[in-house]
Amino acid sequence: MVRGVPPEKQKGLLPDAWFDAWWEAALRPDPAGVGQTPPVVRAPNGIIEDLRKYWMSGKPHYDPANIAVPTLLILAEWDADAPPYMAQAIFANLKNTPAKRMVMIGEGTHSVVMEKNRLQLFREVQLFLEEPK
């Protein structure tokens, strides 16, 4: 069960072969994680501290108004970890960027980079990087 995804849409969202390839690549650089049974992907604690200090307390980690470069926000329709309203709030506060764009990837979650619509994500990033600023 993938949080936030309608039950009828869950099958096929994340292709097995793609996840398997990611899992192998994620384990490779960490011999300590690979050596555990079962193997684990270890992550630094900093993200947990940031969650407690900023997200859970409602304090922003940074001020979007301080961003002064072209900015692309990409969000996924079913992202339960960083729901669309969060990106919309950031977008509204990008007051000093010379250009801003927000794109929603349909039928995607926080793991959209591994999901069936990942090519749309890649395409949007490529277009943004290649366009004249």
Predicted regions and their residues:
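Short beta-strand/loop motif that positions the catalytic acidic residue
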Residues: 67, 73-75, 79
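C-terminal alpha-helix
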Residues: 124-132
